Design a protein with these regions (language model features):
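Cytosolic juxtamembrane N-terminal segment immediately preceding the first transmembrane helix
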Residues: 1-32
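Hydrophobic core of transmembrane alpha-helices in multi-pass small-molecule transporters
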Residues: 30, 105, 118-135
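Small-residue (Gly/Pro/Ala) motifs that create kinks and tight helix-helix packing interfaces
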Residues: 42, 82, 166-182
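Intracellular juxtamembrane helix-capping segments at the cytosolic ends
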Residues: 45, 133-156
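Central cavity-lining transmembrane alpha-helices of secondary-active solute carriers
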Residues: 66-84
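C-terminal ends and interior cores of transmembrane alpha-helices
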Residues: 100-115
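Glycine-rich segments within core transmembrane alpha-helices of 12-TM secondary carriers
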Residues: 149-172
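Symmetry-related core transmembrane helices of the 12-TM Major Facilitator Superfamily/SLC fold
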Residues: 190-209
Length: 209
């Protein structure tokens, strides 16, 4: 049923233009680049209970500040650990795995916000999201380099450009969603996480397939 994800089914057919690859990679980059926009959640996460101001039961900025660091740690770790698997599995299967991890990380984080369990946010955004970042980044970068062996700098440049662009889009989008879902008894973080998981899951799936 999922055999179309296998490496042998990702061989380009005659007439395929390699310039179709960068837009697909850009879809991925603009999503996973959201990791660099996580700081917009730091302050709202310290007011989940107090809403307008931090309550004694709320988390401190120091407690939530390490979530981004965890994501970066697992980005590097996943890249190193799963690098050979990505080459064996092929870009399509690797990107689907990255999508499941990255989007799933938002859903787990939303559960952590609703239940006020900080470790779930570390698990969701930090571990799962970080692994999705790592797998997603190396899979499309290696694919771009293979398609553009005559322009390796251009290939990696396109990837890095999209990665940075993801933060530029992700930051205002996250703020917009939190403001939209905010109410007198909620800062809107949980709902924003769910919405982002759906949005990024959809766009990453399009880019992967």
């Amino acid at each position: 049923m999922l055999s179309f994800l296998d490496r042998e089914h990702t061989v380009a057919k005659p007439g395929f233009s390699r310039w179709m690859v960068p837009p697909a990679a850009l879809f991925i980059d603009l999503c996973i680049g959201h990791a660099y926009a996580f700081s917009v959640f730091n302050l709202p996460l310290t007011k989940l209970i107090g809403v307008t101001a931090s309550a004694p039961q709320d988390w401190t900025l120091a407690e939530v500040g390490w979530i981004f660091s965890f994501a970066m740690l697992f980005l590097g770790s996943a890249s190193a650990v799963f690098g050979k698997w990505v080459e064996r599995a092929g870009p399509r299967k690797a990107m689907v795995a990255a999508t499941c991890c990255f989007a799933g990380g938002f859903f787990v984080s939303a559960l952590g916000v609703v239940t006020h369990q900080l470790w779930l946010i570390y698990l969701g955004y930090g571990v799962l999201g970080g692994c999705g970042l790592g797998i997603g980044y190396i899979s499309h970068v290696s694919t771009l380099i293979k398609w553009f062996p005559d322009h390796p700098g251009l290939a990696t440049g396109m990837a890095i450009c999209g990665f940075g662009g993801g933060a530029m889009i992700g930051s205002p989008l996250s703020v917009l969603l939190m403001n939209y879902f905010a109410s007198v008894d909620s800062v809107g973080v949980a709902q924003a996480f769910v919405a982002l998981g759906i949005i990024y899951g959809l766009f990453m799936t399009i880019g992967a397939i």
